[in-house]
Amino acid sequence: MTAIIERRESANLWGRFCDWITSTENRLYIGWFGVLMIPTLLTATSVFIIAFIAAPPVDIDGIREPVSGSLLYGNNIISGAIIPTSAAIGLHFYPIWEAASVDEWLYNGGPYELIVLHFLLGVACYMGREWELSFRLGMRPWIAVAYSAPVAAATAVFLIYPIGQGSFSDGMPLGISGTFNFMIVFQAEHNILMHPFHMLGVAGVFGGSLFSAMHGSLVTSSLIRETTENQSANAGYKFGQEEETYNIVAAHGYFGRLIFQYASFNNSRSLHFFLAAWPVAGIWFTALGISTMALNLNGFNFNQSVVDSQGRVINTWADIINRANLGMEVMHERNAHNFPLDLAAVESISIGG
């Protein structure tokens, strides 16, 4: 009898826990995805803060020349970063217990792998949590679909690209200057500015910013007049009021006269779908571009493609970009390679008689 009562209380406790986890009445919705999201993001954030402040230098290139990234080792907020895991580790799973000591784990950049893997799992769970809350409220799933774009971008630079290149040392450093360094090296090695998917991503991000600014300014400019012509149109309104204050028909008419009729939307749902879909599609393409360049399917190469009747090269802008790429590649990993790979791969020219 006692065992039956204990089992019933245990089942009742589990049921109450499930109800609390999935309740939409909580101030912050947790959900089953949140059960995994909370510990993974807390772990990633905690280790990031500690490592950014105090992590020792990391042998990123695997050549016994450690690179300092933390504040206590001479960096500031701009130059500081979590240095990627050493090339000596490659793509191996490298938790603390795989190293001979904590000092060795830190020297080989173990915190980077720990942070990145927990972070990616956490943001994926955040996306799942968005879908879960939408489902429980009877909403459609497009919020999670929109969030999949930055999740795909983060996964591309932190996981797909290192896998394609064969080492976590090729992942993006976790810091401001580290991000810019990653971008410069990426351009040098993959000519990303000449990749059509990157161009679509730029159009998505900048176009999305433009459309958001246009939409916001139109909405805040087209008031439903509640006053006479002798009074200010702003009279009678207060900031943050619940009642609708703008007229989409008026905004549509204004924009149609400013550009042309069919450049504007007269349907609010179509307009907001477009505002969401444009940047999301662009960022999806960028993530896809990073993933293809991970396998060295690089941007267009028009180097030395224009020649005169004598076969002499007429330099174009593509050749200028190529020269800049070689210069950036020379600066990158200057102690690990004598020459950029582009030069080292070319057979030496015999100058003997």
Curated annotation (Swiss-Prot):
GO terms for biological process: photosynthetic electron transport in photosystem II; response to herbicide. This is Photosystem II protein D1. 2 of the reaction center chlorophylls (ChlD1 and ChlD2) are entirely coordinated by water. Its EC number is 1.10.3.9. The chain crosses the membrane at residues 29-46, 118-133, 142-156, 197-218, 274-288. Photosystem II (PSII) is a light-driven water:plastoquinone oxidoreductase that uses light energy to abstract electrons from H(2)O, generating O(2) and a proton gradient subsequently used for ATP formation. It consists of a core antenna complex that captures photons, and an electron transfer chain that converts photonic excitation into a charge separation. The D1/D2 (PsbA/PsbD) reaction center heterodimer binds P680, the primary electron donor of PSII as well as several subsequent electron acceptors. InterPro entries: D1/D2, Photo_II_D1/D2_sf, Photo_RC_L/M, Photo_RC_L/M_CS, PSII_D1. It catalyses: 2 a plastoquinone + 4 hnu + 2 H2O = 2 a plastoquinol + O2. Residues 345-353 form a propeptide. Keywords: Acetylation, Calcium, Chlorophyll, Chloroplast, Chromophore, Electron transport, Herbicide resistance, Iron, Magnesium, Manganese, Membrane, Metal-binding, Oxidoreductase, Phosphoprotein, Photosynthesis, Photosystem II, Plastid, Thylakoid, Transmembrane, Transmembrane helix, Transport. The keyword Transmembrane helix applies. Pheophytin a binds at residue 126. SUPFAM superfamilies: Bacterial photosystem II reaction centre, L and M subunits. It comes from Picea abies (Norway spruce). It comes from the Eukaryota. Belongs to the reaction center PufL/M/PsbA/D family. Chlorophyll a PD1 binds at residue 198. It is found in: Plastid, Chloroplast thylakoid membrane.
